[in-house]
Amino acid sequence: MMAVKNKIKELRVQHKITQVQMAKDLQVTRQTIVAIENNHYNPSLELALKIAHYFDLKMEDIFTLK
């Protein structure tokens, strides 16, 4: 089975956004952001779309199969 990898931490750091701020902006907990960044949790389709919109990127630019 293929796993989903993401670039959320890299993008967040590049944009100088804290986990707390990103969580607040996306209306999720900081723990959710941590889990997604560490590939311990795959976001729902809705949250993945929100994250892509947040960074003004396509989903496939953030999430990839490894």
Which residues does each predicted region cover?
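Key DNA-contact positions within bacterial/archaeal DNA-binding proteins
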Residues: 20, 31, 60
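Short basic helix-loop element that most often maps to the first helix and adjoining turn
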Residues: 7-25
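Short amphipathic helical patch at the helix-1/turn junction of helix-turn-helix
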Residues: 2, 13, 41-42
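Recognition helix of helix-turn-helix/homeodomain-like DNA-binding domains
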Residues: 28-41
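DNA major-groove recognition helix of helix-turn-helix/homeodomain DNA-binding modules
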Residues: 47-61
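Short, charged recognition helix plus adjacent turn
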Residues: 64-66
